[in-house]
Amino acid sequence: MNKLLLTAFGFSTPKIINVAQKMIQENKITKACIISTSWPKEKEKHPQMQQIKRDLLSMNIQQVDFLDVEFEDANKLFDYDLIFLNGGYPFYLLHYIKKSGADQILKRINQNGELIFGLSAGSIILGPSIALMQYLYPEDNQFNDSNLDGLNLTDIHVYPHFKEMLTRDPTIKDKINKYENETGINITRLNNDQALAVNNDTQTLLD
């Protein structure tokens, strides 16, 4: 079973909220864990972390906790039936997901049919690779990691905040097109008001 929700900006539209709520209700989710590692300094104190916790609680999930796999035991993830990989720095997040062994744990959780939601960086690392991030933002690879393999829970390569990034860097469109032409890899561009729901082999764009 493969049940994922890949978002660019969390529960940003009524449609995304409705789909998330349906997934939560159908799977009888009572305990959720937000992985807070993606913000190196702020961790769970980051406003985005707190917003996601409020959102999940508003969906009638009884317990929502934070877990920082940089410092805490990743095996605690087995105690939850929904894992939320929050946004932040994809290189930093993936580095500690792998170092802590959370990568293998998340794969087992996914195989068991539990829900995994991603936001931005969290959505990126659920895919096959973060090589696009290395191509676009090599300066962010602070650990100089050469293994850029993602968790590979989906074959979707996500680039989040596409429309929003265009206003900051108009060249991003050409850069991603060039990457696709050079690698043959298709990049799914998600704007902040979009998400992808994955149910086994079915992928649904929410926009």
Question: Model-predicted segments: where are they?
Answer:
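Charged helix-capping and loop-helix junction motifs
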Residues: 47-51, 97-104, 172-173
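Short glycine-/acidic-enriched loop or helix-start segments at secondary-structure transitions
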Residues: 15-17, 44, 94-96, 126-129, ...
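Structural motif
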Residues: 5-6, 82-86, 117-118, 157-158
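N-terminal beta1-alpha1 cap of cysteine-dependent amidohydrolase-like domains
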Residues: 1-82
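Flexible gly/pro-rich beta->alpha loop and the following alpha-helix that scaffold active-site loops
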Residues: 65-114
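Conserved anion/nucleotide-ligand pocket segment
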Residues: 149-193, 199
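Short acidic-glycine loop/turn motifs at beta-strand connectors
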Residues: 197-202, 207
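Class I SAM-dependent methyltransferase SAM-binding "motif I" and its flanking Rossmann-like core
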Residues: 95-96, 103-164
